[in-house]
Protein backbone atom coordinates (compact mmCIF):
# COMPACT_ATOMS: atom_id res chain seq x y z
CA UNK A 1 0.00 0.00 0.00
CA UNK A 2 1.14 3.54 0.74
CA UNK A 3 4.93 3.94 0.94
CA UNK A 4 6.32 5.28 4.20
CA UNK A 5 6.40 8.89 5.21
CA UNK A 6 9.97 9.99 5.81
CA UNK A 7 11.41 12.76 7.89
CA UNK A 8 13.79 13.66 5.03
CA UNK A 9 17.51 13.78 5.77
CA UNK A 10 20.28 15.66 4.05
CA UNK A 11 22.05 12.39 3.34
CA UNK A 12 19.11 10.94 1.42
CA UNK A 13 18.57 14.19 -0.46
CA UNK A 14 22.19 14.32 -1.55
CA UNK A 15 22.02 10.69 -2.72
CA UNK A 16 18.93 11.45 -4.80
CA UNK A 17 20.54 14.54 -6.28
CA UNK A 18 23.71 12.65 -7.18
CA UNK A 19 21.72 9.81 -8.78
CA UNK A 20 19.67 12.16 -10.94
CA UNK A 21 22.72 14.22 -11.95
CA UNK A 22 24.45 11.00 -13.02
CA UNK A 23 21.45 10.04 -15.12
CA UNK A 24 21.26 13.46 -16.76
CA UNK A 25 25.00 13.49 -17.50
CA UNK A 26 24.91 10.03 -19.15
CA UNK A 27 26.16 9.90 -22.77
CA UNK A 28 23.63 11.29 -25.19
CA UNK A 29 21.51 12.66 -22.36
CA UNK A 30 19.87 9.27 -21.88
CA UNK A 31 19.56 7.35 -18.66
CA UNK A 32 22.54 5.34 -17.48
CA UNK A 33 22.46 1.63 -18.41
CA UNK A 34 20.91 -0.72 -15.89
CA UNK A 35 23.21 -2.56 -13.53
CA UNK A 36 22.97 -6.29 -12.72
CA UNK A 37 20.92 -5.65 -9.57
CA UNK A 38 18.45 -3.52 -11.50
CA UNK A 39 18.11 -6.16 -14.22
CA UNK A 40 17.40 -8.88 -11.66
CA UNK A 41 14.91 -6.63 -9.88
CA UNK A 42 13.17 -5.82 -13.15
CA UNK A 43 12.95 -9.50 -14.10
CA UNK A 44 11.53 -10.62 -10.75
CA UNK A 45 8.97 -7.82 -10.58
CA UNK A 46 7.91 -8.45 -14.17
CA UNK A 47 7.34 -12.14 -13.43
CA UNK A 48 5.30 -11.24 -10.35
CA UNK A 49 3.13 -8.79 -12.28
CA UNK A 50 2.56 -11.18 -15.20
CA UNK A 51 1.71 -14.08 -12.87
CA UNK A 52 -0.76 -11.89 -10.96
CA UNK A 53 -2.41 -10.78 -14.20
CA UNK A 54 -2.67 -14.27 -15.71
CA UNK A 55 -3.90 -15.93 -12.53
CA UNK A 56 -6.70 -13.46 -11.88
CA UNK A 57 -7.70 -13.20 -15.54
CA UNK A 58 -7.99 -17.00 -15.61
CA UNK A 59 -10.27 -16.94 -12.55
CA UNK A 60 -12.56 -14.35 -14.13
CA UNK A 61 -12.60 -16.19 -17.47
CA UNK A 62 -13.45 -19.49 -15.77
CA UNK A 63 -16.46 -18.02 -13.99
CA UNK A 64 -17.68 -16.22 -17.12
CA UNK A 65 -17.40 -19.41 -19.18
CA UNK A 66 -18.86 -21.91 -16.71
CA UNK A 67 -22.58 -21.74 -15.94
CA UNK A 68 -22.00 -24.06 -12.98
CA UNK A 69 -19.51 -21.61 -11.44
CA UNK A 70 -21.75 -18.63 -12.13
CA UNK A 71 -24.61 -20.32 -10.28
CA UNK A 72 -22.72 -20.27 -6.97
CA UNK A 73 -23.18 -17.11 -4.92
CA UNK A 74 -19.75 -17.51 -3.36
CA UNK A 75 -18.12 -16.98 -6.74
CA UNK A 76 -19.43 -13.42 -6.80
CA UNK A 77 -16.96 -12.75 -4.00
CA UNK A 78 -14.25 -14.67 -5.85
CA UNK A 79 -14.78 -12.47 -8.92
CA UNK A 80 -14.64 -9.34 -6.78
CA UNK A 81 -11.40 -10.56 -5.21
CA UNK A 82 -9.93 -11.36 -8.63
CA UNK A 83 -10.89 -7.91 -9.96
CA UNK A 84 -9.29 -6.14 -7.00
CA UNK A 85 -6.13 -8.20 -7.48
CA UNK A 86 -6.19 -7.41 -11.20
CA UNK A 87 -6.33 -3.71 -10.34
CA UNK A 88 -3.33 -4.18 -8.07
CA UNK A 89 -1.43 -5.72 -10.99
CA UNK A 90 -2.54 -3.04 -13.48
CA UNK A 91 -2.83 0.19 -11.51
CA UNK A 92 -0.31 -0.25 -8.72
CA UNK A 93 2.51 -2.71 -9.38
CA UNK A 94 3.82 -1.54 -12.80
CA UNK A 95 4.35 2.09 -11.78
CA UNK A 96 6.18 1.16 -8.61
CA UNK A 97 8.25 -1.43 -10.49
CA UNK A 98 9.45 1.22 -12.94
CA UNK A 99 10.34 3.50 -10.04
CA UNK A 100 12.23 0.69 -8.30
CA UNK A 101 14.32 -0.01 -11.39
CA UNK A 102 14.85 3.63 -12.38
CA UNK A 103 15.72 4.68 -8.85
CA UNK A 104 13.30 7.61 -8.82
CA UNK A 105 9.64 8.38 -9.49
CA UNK A 106 9.40 9.36 -13.18
CA UNK A 107 5.64 9.97 -13.38
CA UNK A 108 5.44 13.36 -11.70
CA UNK A 109 2.02 14.50 -10.49
CA UNK A 110 0.52 11.06 -11.12
CA UNK A 111 1.91 10.20 -7.67
CA UNK A 112 -1.22 11.26 -5.75
CA UNK A 113 -3.52 9.30 -8.06
CA UNK A 114 -1.25 6.26 -7.80
CA UNK A 115 -1.26 6.49 -4.01
CA UNK A 116 -5.08 6.55 -4.04
CA UNK A 117 -5.19 3.52 -6.37
CA UNK A 118 -2.72 1.73 -4.12
CA UNK A 119 -4.80 2.20 -0.98
CA UNK A 120 -8.09 1.45 -2.75
CA UNK A 121 -7.02 -1.76 -4.50
CA UNK A 122 -5.12 -3.21 -1.55
CA UNK A 123 -7.97 -2.43 0.84
CA UNK A 124 -10.55 -3.90 -1.55
CA UNK A 125 -8.52 -7.10 -1.87
CA UNK A 126 -8.27 -7.53 1.91
CA UNK A 127 -11.94 -6.71 2.50
CA UNK A 128 -12.95 -9.27 -0.14
CA UNK A 129 -10.89 -11.90 1.66
CA UNK A 130 -12.74 -11.00 4.85
CA UNK A 131 -16.13 -11.26 3.12
CA UNK A 132 -15.22 -14.71 1.75
CA UNK A 133 -14.40 -15.94 5.26
CA UNK A 134 -17.70 -14.62 6.64
CA UNK A 135 -19.61 -16.12 3.70
CA UNK A 136 -18.05 -19.55 4.27
CA UNK A 137 -18.79 -19.39 7.99
CA UNK A 138 -22.45 -18.56 7.36
CA UNK A 139 -22.73 -21.32 4.74
CA UNK A 140 -21.28 -23.93 7.08
CA UNK A 141 -22.83 -22.90 10.39
CA UNK A 142 -26.32 -22.06 9.09
CA UNK A 143 -26.65 -23.81 5.70
CA UNK A 144 -30.43 -23.71 5.35
CA UNK A 145 -30.73 -20.06 6.33
CA UNK A 146 -27.78 -19.34 4.07
CA UNK A 147 -29.54 -20.94 1.09
CA UNK A 148 -32.60 -18.75 1.70
CA UNK A 149 -30.89 -15.48 2.59
CA UNK A 150 -27.73 -15.40 0.46
CA UNK A 151 -29.22 -14.20 -2.81
CA UNK A 152 -27.39 -12.53 -5.66
CA UNK A 153 -28.67 -9.18 -4.45
CA UNK A 154 -27.25 -9.68 -0.95
CA UNK A 155 -23.91 -10.80 -2.37
CA UNK A 156 -23.70 -7.76 -4.65
CA UNK A 157 -24.56 -5.44 -1.76
CA UNK A 158 -21.72 -6.95 0.32
CA UNK A 159 -19.29 -6.50 -2.56
CA UNK A 160 -20.48 -2.93 -3.15
CA UNK A 161 -19.95 -2.08 0.52
CA UNK A 162 -16.38 -3.39 0.38
CA UNK A 163 -15.53 -1.33 -2.69
CA UNK A 164 -17.31 1.77 -1.38
CA UNK A 165 -15.36 1.63 1.87
CA UNK A 166 -12.13 1.15 -0.08
CA UNK A 167 -12.83 4.24 -2.18
CA UNK A 168 -13.86 6.33 0.82
CA UNK A 169 -10.61 5.74 2.71
CA UNK A 170 -8.41 6.23 -0.36
CA UNK A 171 -9.44 8.81 -2.95
CA UNK A 172 -11.20 11.28 -0.67
CA UNK A 173 -8.41 11.66 1.95
CA UNK A 174 -5.63 11.56 -0.65
CA UNK A 175 -7.19 14.07 -3.05
CA UNK A 176 -8.07 16.41 -0.18
CA UNK A 177 -4.57 15.96 1.24
CA UNK A 178 -5.92 14.77 4.60
CA UNK A 179 -3.48 11.87 4.75
CA UNK A 180 -0.26 13.87 4.82
CA UNK A 181 1.72 14.84 7.87
CA UNK A 182 1.58 18.59 7.29
CA UNK A 183 3.98 19.39 10.06
CA UNK A 184 6.47 16.89 8.67
CA UNK A 185 6.12 18.13 5.10
CA UNK A 186 6.52 21.78 6.12
CA UNK A 187 9.40 21.27 8.48
CA UNK A 188 11.71 18.72 6.92
CA UNK A 189 14.89 18.41 8.87
CA UNK A 190 17.00 17.36 5.90
CA UNK A 191 18.53 20.12 3.79
CA UNK A 192 20.35 19.89 0.51
CA UNK A 193 22.35 22.86 1.66
CA UNK A 194 22.10 25.37 4.46
CA UNK A 195 19.41 27.25 2.54
CA UNK A 196 17.70 24.73 0.26
CA UNK A 197 14.74 22.95 1.81
CA UNK A 198 14.00 19.30 1.04
CA UNK A 199 10.98 20.01 -1.14
CA UNK A 200 12.96 22.24 -3.48
CA UNK A 201 15.63 19.58 -3.83
CA UNK A 202 13.04 16.86 -4.35
CA UNK A 203 12.73 17.53 -8.08
CA UNK A 204 15.29 17.88 -10.80
CA UNK A 205 14.51 18.53 -14.47
CA UNK A 206 10.84 17.91 -13.68
CA UNK A 207 11.52 14.42 -12.32
CA UNK A 208 10.30 13.67 -8.81
CA UNK A 209 12.85 12.00 -6.56
CA UNK A 210 10.26 9.83 -4.83
CA UNK A 211 6.54 9.21 -4.47
CA UNK A 212 6.72 8.76 -0.74
CA UNK A 213 4.30 10.68 1.43
CA UNK A 214 4.35 11.53 5.10
CA UNK A 215 1.25 9.99 6.67
CA UNK A 216 -0.16 11.71 9.69
CA UNK A 217 -0.62 9.50 12.70
CA UNK A 218 -4.41 9.63 12.69
CA UNK A 219 -4.71 8.50 9.07
CA UNK A 220 -2.01 5.84 9.38
CA UNK A 221 -3.73 4.17 12.34
CA UNK A 222 -7.34 4.56 11.16
CA UNK A 223 -6.63 3.34 7.62
CA UNK A 224 -4.61 0.39 8.94
CA UNK A 225 -7.47 -0.59 11.25
CA UNK A 226 -10.01 -0.52 8.42
CA UNK A 227 -7.76 -2.06 5.79
CA UNK A 228 -6.14 -4.81 7.83
CA UNK A 229 -6.47 -5.18 11.59
CA UNK A 230 -10.27 -5.40 11.80
CA UNK A 231 -10.56 -7.72 8.75
CA UNK A 232 -7.80 -10.03 10.00
CA UNK A 233 -9.47 -10.28 13.41
CA UNK A 234 -12.75 -11.26 11.74
CA UNK A 235 -10.96 -13.85 9.59
CA UNK A 236 -9.26 -15.43 12.59
CA UNK A 237 -12.60 -15.77 14.41
CA UNK A 238 -14.50 -17.17 11.41
CA UNK A 239 -11.84 -19.68 10.35
CA UNK A 240 -11.39 -20.88 13.94
CA UNK A 241 -15.12 -21.56 14.18
CA UNK A 242 -15.15 -23.19 10.76
CA UNK A 243 -12.42 -25.59 11.89
CA UNK A 244 -14.39 -26.54 14.99
CA UNK A 245 -17.55 -27.19 12.96
CA UNK A 246 -15.58 -29.23 10.42
CA UNK A 247 -13.95 -31.24 13.18
CA UNK A 248 -17.31 -32.17 14.73
CA UNK A 249 -18.86 -33.17 11.39
CA UNK A 250 -15.86 -35.24 10.32
CA UNK A 251 -15.90 -37.16 13.59
CA UNK A 252 -19.64 -37.80 13.49
CA UNK A 253 -19.65 -39.08 9.93
CA UNK A 254 -16.51 -41.09 10.61
CA UNK A 255 -18.35 -42.84 13.45
CA UNK A 256 -20.91 -44.08 10.91
CA UNK A 257 -18.14 -45.32 8.62
CA UNK A 258 -16.45 -47.17 11.47
CA UNK A 259 -19.72 -48.78 12.52
CA UNK A 260 -20.43 -50.03 8.98
CA UNK A 261 -16.89 -51.28 8.39
CA UNK A 262 -16.82 -52.96 11.78
CA UNK A 263 -20.12 -54.76 11.21
CA UNK A 264 -19.12 -55.81 7.70
CA UNK A 265 -15.83 -57.20 9.00
CA UNK A 266 -17.58 -59.14 11.77
CA UNK A 267 -20.15 -60.70 9.43
CA UNK A 268 -17.78 -61.57 6.60
CA UNK A 269 -14.86 -62.91 8.64
CA UNK A 270 -16.61 -63.96 11.81
CA UNK A 271 -14.06 -61.99 13.82
CA UNK A 272 -13.88 -58.26 14.45
CA UNK A 273 -10.67 -56.49 13.46
CA UNK A 274 -9.63 -52.87 13.99
CA UNK A 275 -10.53 -50.59 11.09
CA UNK A 276 -8.57 -47.63 9.73
CA UNK A 277 -11.47 -45.16 9.80
CA UNK A 278 -10.26 -43.42 12.94
CA UNK A 279 -6.89 -42.77 11.38
CA UNK A 280 -8.61 -41.51 8.23
CA UNK A 281 -10.71 -39.17 10.34
CA UNK A 282 -7.63 -37.78 12.04
CA UNK A 283 -6.00 -37.31 8.63
CA UNK A 284 -8.99 -35.35 7.38
CA UNK A 285 -8.96 -33.14 10.46
CA UNK A 286 -5.25 -32.55 9.97
CA UNK A 287 -5.81 -31.61 6.34
CA UNK A 288 -8.57 -29.20 7.30
CA UNK A 289 -6.26 -27.62 9.84
CA UNK A 290 -3.45 -27.35 7.28
CA UNK A 291 -5.82 -25.82 4.76
CA UNK A 292 -7.01 -23.14 7.15
CA UNK A 293 -3.44 -22.55 8.26
CA UNK A 294 -2.40 -21.93 4.65
CA UNK A 295 -5.27 -19.49 4.12
CA UNK A 296 -4.48 -17.44 7.20
CA UNK A 297 -0.73 -17.97 7.12
CA UNK A 298 -0.25 -16.65 3.59
CA UNK A 299 -2.46 -13.64 4.24
CA UNK A 300 -0.82 -12.70 7.55
CA UNK A 301 2.75 -13.29 6.32
CA UNK A 302 2.15 -11.10 3.29
CA UNK A 303 0.44 -8.14 4.95
CA UNK A 304 1.26 -8.05 8.66
CA UNK A 305 4.88 -6.76 8.35
CA UNK A 306 3.76 -3.88 6.15
CA UNK A 307 0.95 -2.76 8.42
CA UNK A 308 3.17 -2.93 11.49
CA UNK A 309 5.64 -0.60 9.79
CA UNK A 310 2.83 1.54 8.39
CA UNK A 311 1.73 2.34 11.95
CA UNK A 312 5.29 2.75 13.26
CA UNK A 313 6.66 5.13 10.64
CA UNK A 314 4.59 8.22 11.61
CA UNK A 315 5.91 7.85 15.16
CA UNK A 316 9.56 7.32 14.25
CA UNK A 317 12.32 9.83 14.71
CA UNK A 318 15.40 10.15 12.53
CA UNK A 319 17.54 11.26 15.46
CA UNK A 320 19.20 14.18 13.67
CA UNK A 321 21.51 16.54 15.44
CA UNK A 322 18.74 19.11 15.82
CA UNK A 323 17.05 17.10 18.57
CA UNK A 324 17.16 13.91 20.61
CA UNK A 325 15.84 10.60 19.23
CA UNK A 326 12.23 9.99 20.27
CA UNK A 327 9.64 7.38 19.33
CA UNK A 328 10.34 4.33 17.18
CA UNK A 329 13.54 4.05 15.15
CA UNK A 330 12.97 4.72 11.46
CA UNK A 331 13.24 1.86 8.99
CA UNK A 332 15.16 2.04 5.77
CA UNK A 333 13.32 2.70 2.53
CA UNK A 334 14.58 -0.60 1.12
CA UNK A 335 13.13 -2.57 4.04
CA UNK A 336 9.79 -0.83 3.73
CA UNK A 337 9.63 -1.36 -0.04
CA UNK A 338 10.35 -5.08 0.37
CA UNK A 339 7.37 -5.46 2.71
CA UNK A 340 5.20 -3.39 0.37
CA UNK A 341 5.91 -5.90 -2.39
CA UNK A 342 5.22 -8.77 0.02
CA UNK A 343 1.74 -7.34 0.52
CA UNK A 344 1.11 -6.96 -3.18
CA UNK A 345 2.38 -10.51 -3.75
CA UNK A 346 -0.70 -11.70 -1.87
CA UNK A 347 -2.69 -10.76 -4.99
CA UNK A 348 -0.68 -13.31 -6.98
CA UNK A 349 -1.38 -16.07 -4.45
CA UNK A 350 -5.11 -15.52 -4.00
CA UNK A 351 -6.08 -17.27 -7.28
CA UNK A 352 -4.18 -20.37 -6.15
CA UNK A 353 -5.68 -20.37 -2.67
CA UNK A 354 -9.30 -19.46 -3.34
CA UNK A 355 -9.98 -20.71 -6.87
CA UNK A 356 -8.16 -24.02 -7.15
CA UNK A 357 -10.86 -26.47 -6.17
CA UNK A 358 -11.91 -29.23 -8.56
CA UNK A 359 -14.68 -27.19 -10.21
CA UNK A 360 -12.29 -24.39 -11.10
CA UNK A 361 -9.49 -26.74 -12.12
CA UNK A 362 -11.71 -28.43 -14.68
CA UNK A 363 -12.59 -25.13 -16.29
CA UNK A 364 -8.95 -24.02 -16.12
CA UNK A 365 -7.96 -27.23 -17.91
CA UNK A 366 -10.52 -26.58 -20.63
CA UNK A 367 -9.35 -22.99 -21.07
CA UNK A 368 -5.71 -24.08 -21.25
CA UNK A 369 -6.44 -27.15 -23.40
CA UNK A 370 -5.04 -29.77 -21.02
CA UNK A 371 -8.20 -31.53 -19.82
CA UNK A 372 -6.88 -35.06 -20.42
CA UNK A 373 -3.51 -34.38 -18.84
CA UNK A 374 -4.87 -32.69 -15.73
CA UNK A 375 -7.49 -35.27 -14.71
CA UNK A 376 -6.17 -38.75 -15.45
CA UNK A 377 -6.14 -40.28 -11.97
CA UNK A 378 -8.13 -39.37 -8.89
CA UNK A 379 -5.85 -38.41 -6.04
CA UNK A 380 -6.95 -37.92 -2.47
CA UNK A 381 -6.48 -34.26 -1.71
CA UNK A 382 -7.81 -31.46 0.39
CA UNK A 383 -8.27 -28.46 -1.84
CA UNK A 384 -8.45 -24.87 -0.70
CA UNK A 385 -11.46 -23.65 -2.61
CA UNK A 386 -14.15 -21.05 -2.78
CA UNK A 387 -16.16 -23.35 -0.53
CA UNK A 388 -13.14 -23.75 1.73
CA UNK A 389 -12.48 -27.48 2.08
CA UNK A 390 -12.96 -30.10 -0.62
CA UNK A 391 -12.33 -33.82 -0.55
CA UNK A 392 -11.58 -35.52 -3.86
CA UNK A 393 -11.12 -39.25 -3.46
CA UNK A 394 -11.22 -42.52 -5.33
CA UNK A 395 -14.75 -43.73 -4.63
CA UNK A 396 -14.52 -47.50 -5.21
CA UNK A 397 -13.90 -48.35 -1.58
CA UNK A 398 -16.61 -45.98 -0.40
CA UNK A 399 -19.19 -47.45 -2.75
CA UNK A 400 -18.60 -50.76 -0.99
CA UNK A 401 -19.15 -49.08 2.38
CA UNK A 402 -22.37 -47.47 1.17
CA UNK A 403 -23.59 -50.83 -0.15
CA UNK A 404 -22.84 -52.35 3.24
CA UNK A 405 -24.98 -49.67 4.86
CA UNK A 406 -27.88 -50.40 2.55
CA UNK A 407 -27.84 -54.13 3.40
CA UNK A 408 -26.97 -53.91 7.07
CA UNK A 409 -28.99 -51.04 8.53
CA UNK A 410 -32.55 -52.11 9.42
CA UNK A 411 -35.48 -50.29 7.93
CA UNK A 412 -37.05 -47.46 9.84
CA UNK A 413 -39.82 -48.53 12.18
CA UNK A 414 -42.50 -46.70 14.09
CA UNK A 415 -42.01 -45.69 17.71
CA UNK A 416 -44.52 -48.34 18.87
CA UNK A 417 -42.74 -51.16 17.06
CA UNK A 418 -39.43 -49.96 18.44
CA UNK A 419 -40.68 -50.25 22.02
CA UNK A 420 -41.97 -53.80 21.43
CA UNK A 421 -38.82 -55.06 19.71
CA UNK A 422 -36.29 -52.99 21.63
CA UNK A 423 -34.43 -55.97 23.11
CA UNK A 424 -34.28 -57.86 19.80
CA UNK A 425 -32.94 -54.79 18.00
CA UNK A 426 -30.31 -54.32 20.68
CA UNK A 427 -29.03 -57.85 20.00
CA UNK A 428 -29.06 -57.41 16.23
CA UNK A 429 -27.32 -54.04 16.28
CA UNK A 430 -24.08 -55.58 17.45
CA UNK A 431 -21.37 -52.96 17.19
CA UNK A 432 -23.79 -50.15 16.25
CA UNK A 433 -24.11 -47.55 18.98
CA UNK A 434 -26.80 -44.96 19.55
CA UNK A 435 -25.10 -42.65 17.06
CA UNK A 436 -26.08 -44.95 14.19
CA UNK A 437 -29.81 -45.26 14.98
CA UNK A 438 -32.20 -44.47 12.17
CA UNK A 439 -34.62 -41.67 12.97
CA UNK A 440 -38.34 -42.58 12.78
CA UNK A 441 -38.83 -39.64 10.44
CA UNK A 442 -36.28 -40.91 7.97
CA UNK A 443 -38.03 -41.25 4.62
CA UNK A 444 -35.95 -44.06 3.20
CA UNK A 445 -34.21 -45.55 6.19
CA UNK A 446 -30.96 -45.13 4.21
CA UNK A 447 -29.95 -41.76 5.54
CA UNK A 448 -26.70 -43.06 6.94
CA UNK A 449 -25.78 -44.41 3.53
CA UNK A 450 -26.64 -41.05 2.01
CA UNK A 451 -24.34 -39.32 4.47
CA UNK A 452 -21.47 -41.54 3.40
CA UNK A 453 -22.19 -40.88 -0.26
CA UNK A 454 -22.40 -37.18 0.50
CA UNK A 455 -19.02 -37.09 2.17
CA UNK A 456 -17.00 -39.56 0.18
CA UNK A 457 -18.70 -40.59 -3.05
CA UNK A 458 -19.38 -37.30 -4.74
CA UNK A 459 -16.87 -36.02 -7.19
CA UNK A 460 -16.30 -32.83 -5.21
CA UNK A 461 -17.74 -32.31 -1.76
CA UNK A 462 -16.86 -29.48 0.55
CA UNK A 463 -17.68 -28.50 4.06
CA UNK A 464 -19.80 -25.78 2.56
CA UNK A 465 -22.12 -28.53 1.30
CA UNK A 466 -22.23 -30.65 4.46
CA UNK A 467 -25.35 -29.92 6.47
CA UNK A 468 -25.23 -29.85 10.26
CA UNK A 469 -25.95 -33.17 11.95
CA UNK A 470 -28.51 -33.80 14.65
CA UNK A 471 -27.46 -35.38 17.96
CA UNK A 472 -28.31 -38.74 16.33
CA UNK A 473 -25.82 -37.95 13.57
CA UNK A 474 -28.36 -37.26 10.82
CA UNK A 475 -28.76 -34.25 8.64
CA UNK A 476 -31.45 -31.78 9.49
CA UNK A 477 -34.19 -31.27 6.98
CA UNK A 478 -35.35 -27.89 5.94
From Swiss-Prot:
User: Which residue ranges have biased composition labelled Acidic residues?
Assistant: 420-430
- TM region(s), chain numbering: 39-64, 76-102, 112-134, 154-179, 216-240, 290-317, 336-357
The residues exposed to the Extracellular compartment are: 1-38, 103-111, 180-215, 318-335
Cystine residue pairs: 111-211
Report the glycosylation sites. Answer: 7
GO function term, MF aspect, one: G protein-coupled receptor activity
Name its cellular compartments: Cell membrane
Concerning PROSITE patterns, the annotation shows: G_PROTEIN_RECEP_F1_1, G_PROTEIN_RECEP_F1_2
- Lipid moiety (S-palmitoyl cysteine) attached at 370
| PANTHER family (alphabetical) | ADRENERGIC RECEPTOR-RELATED G-PROTEIN COUPLED RECEPTOR (PTHR24248), D(1B) DOPAMINE RECEPTOR (PTHR24248:SF136)
Query: Per its database record, what is this protein's job?
Result: Dopamine receptor whose activity is mediated by G proteins which activate adenylyl cyclase.
Q: Name it.
A: D(1B) dopamine receptor
Provenance organism: Mus musculus
Amino acid sequence: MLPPGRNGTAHRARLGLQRQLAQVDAPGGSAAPLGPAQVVTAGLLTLLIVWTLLGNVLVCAAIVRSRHLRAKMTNIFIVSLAVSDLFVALLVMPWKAVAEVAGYWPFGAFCDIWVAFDIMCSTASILNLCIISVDRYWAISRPFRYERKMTQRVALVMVALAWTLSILISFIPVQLNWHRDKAGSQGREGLLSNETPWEEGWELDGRTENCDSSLNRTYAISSSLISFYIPVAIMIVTYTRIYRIAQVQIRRISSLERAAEHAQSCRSRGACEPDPSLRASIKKETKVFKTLSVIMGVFVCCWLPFFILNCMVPFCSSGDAQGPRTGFPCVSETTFDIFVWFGWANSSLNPIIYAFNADFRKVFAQLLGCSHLCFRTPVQTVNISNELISYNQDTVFHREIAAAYVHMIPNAVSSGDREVGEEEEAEEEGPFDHMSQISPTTPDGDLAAESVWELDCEEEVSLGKISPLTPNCFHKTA
